[in-house]
Amino acid sequence: MAMSPGPLFLVFLLGLVVIPPTLSQDDSRYTKFLTQHYDAKPKGRDDRYCESMMVKRKLTSFCKDVNTFIHDTKNNIKAICGKKGSPYGRNLRISKSHFQVTTCTHKGRSPRPPCRYRASKGFRYIIIGCENGWPVHFDESFISP
């Protein structure tokens, strides 16, 4: 007499098929977030920094109008998705403390490379989008009134 797989085993197999794509989607969105917005230890924070980082991170196939780099640890940024952040608007979180950032603003007229950027630096609250506890979208930063 052949034994058929039990319902629990089938649920387990279904979990193997469904869960990995979800995790890999979160991972790729988090990786993209890090590529676009994370630089823990910047070397300089002037216009040349912006221009070299935008090229290094491959953000200049068309000149991006604005991009912000966050200078802190991955864990501190991720913590905004939890206790170090507060709900803000729809599906966003605002940091409870300031983060050191450099914002790169395109200063050319053409959207085509070579791209030239103006750097502005400071300590700001940041607003990010999170999925499953991971930062996946940078929304904005501002200095509190």
UniProtKB/Swiss-Prot annotation:
Divalent metal ions, such as Cu2+ and Zn2+, may inhibit the ribonucleolytic activity. One of its GO terms (biological process) is cell growth involved in cardiac muscle cell development. Disulfide bonds join C50-C104, C63-C115, C81-C130. The record marks K64 as: Critical for catalytic activity. Zn(2+) binds at D65, H106, H137. It holds the Pfam family RnaseA. It is found in: Cytoplasmic vesicle, Secretory vesicle lumen; Secreted; Nucleus, Nucleolus. GO terms for cellular component: cytoplasmic vesicle; extracellular region; nucleolus. The keyword Disulfide bond applies. Expressed (at protein level) in macrophages. One of its GO terms (molecular function) is RNA nuclease activity. Residues 1-24 form the signal peptide. It comes from the Eukaryota. CDD domains: RNase_A_canonical (cd06265). A motif (Nucleolar localization signal) lies at residues 55-59. Its EC number is 3.1.27.-. Has ribonuclease activity (in vitro). Seems to lack angiogenic activity. Homodimer. This is Angiogenin-2. The lineage of its organism: Eukaryota, Metazoa, Chordata, Craniata, Vertebrata.
